[in-house]
Amino acid sequence: MMARRDPKSWAKRLVRAQTLQKQRRAPVGPRSPPPDEEDPRLKCKNCGAFGHTARSTRCPMKCWKAALVPATLGKKEGKENLKPWKPRAEANPGPLNKDKGEKEERPRQQDPQRNALLHMFSGKPPEKPLPNGKGSTESSEHLRVASGPMPVHTTSKRPRVDPVLADRSATEMSGRGSVLASLSPLRKASLSSSSSLGPKERQTGAAADIPQPAFRHQGPEPLLVVKPTHSSPEGGCREVPQAASKTHGLLQAVRPQAQDKRPAVTSQPCPPAATHSLGLGSNLSFGPGAKRPAQAPIQACLNFPKKPRLGPFQIPESAIQGGELRAPENLQPPPAATELGPSTSPQMGRRTPAQVPSVDRQPPHSTPCLPTAQACTMSHHPAAGHDGAQPLRVLFRRLENGRWSSSLLAAPSFHSPEKPGAFLAQSPHVSEKSEAPCVRVPPSVLYEDLQVSSSSEDSDSDLE
């Protein structure tokens, strides 16, 4: 009987049994997991739900077929007002409706008053109201347009004048004719009519009464420079610089009642070129060429003399008055002078080249001074090729005009530098001319302080 069975039919049955088992395993609907599989400490990274991980088959992100989609609940037509009601026309309106009607009638009653005011300011004839009630809206349409301010025409009042010009009388304004040359062109035109009312009056005390301009210049207010002229018989007419009209706010109004507070401007001649030669701290004054002068009294016009330039062998007077003598540093000491050691003298001290003042600078007061006349010797140490040279003798003399003169004197051979008395015995003519005893000074000090050159004889003749 086993042989009679077909193997193909048996295989078909096996396949059917396997497919049925697969269909039973597949989830038909949303299956609730067993309680032992849920763990609240786990969280899925895909859907963010707790109880399973991202690799679990329970995640709805992996099986979209099992996910539930929220169904639409349909339209709610009852909440939408598809057929709004029309307002009812009540025959007997309530108290609220009466108040609304009164508010609508009030602006209509105010229309005639508004039209009358518009007619006064604008000068337009009042428009007749239209039967449909649009006249009130059209009359006020020009007020809603963004335009400039409405001009107010008043014929009874005159335009307001400058307060400074208003409180001036006609006699005060007549005296401004002498100052019209320094005013701006606009001020000239405004004051020309007022100055022609009365005759010109000559003022002798202070500057003319000038109206203060509407704008003021920041900073100190400059004064008015008045120069007297010889052509006027009374000496009261003054000239004002023409360049003063270029600056704004140059003229300041000097009222009669405020003269006790501000001093009057005195007329004194002042050189116009004094501003170029004044230094710092001096009072400045302006002339015709000044653009913006500073406020300063006119009397203090000082012209300081220029500082004279000194020649290479001239000594400043400040050093002569204090009894100080300084030599200009024009030469460098020879290398032979550095062979001697440092030595000091009672009348001349050793100084460094940094302490030796130059001719152009002001010498310090800490330098040593020399007597009125003194004859000094300076042993010349030549180079190796010049042996047996004679020492140099210099005679300093003070002249009558306050200057110093130096001269070189010829001296015999000097073999013993340690004995200064022998030198005085050999040169008697030097001791007669000198007013102080001669003191031997080391050559190193003389080279640094005096710096005597071979051309000093020529300079002596020039100074005398």
Curated annotation (Swiss-Prot):
Comp. bias intervals (Low complexity): 180-197
Xref: InterPro entries: FAM90 (IPR039213), Znf-CCHC_6 (IPR041670)
The organism's place on the tree of life at top rank: Eukaryota
A Pfam family hit: zf-CCHC_6
Residue ranges of the region described as Disordered: 1-42, 69-387, 410-437
Biased composition (Basic and acidic residues): 74-89, 97-111
Entry's family note: Belongs to the FAM90 family.
PANTHER family linked: FAMILY WITH SEQUENCE SIMILARITY 90 MEMBER A11, PSEUDOGENE-RELATED, PROTEIN FAM90A1
Name of this protein: Protein FAM90A7
Species for this entry: Homo sapiens
Lineage: Eukaryota, Metazoa, Chordata, Craniata, Vertebrata
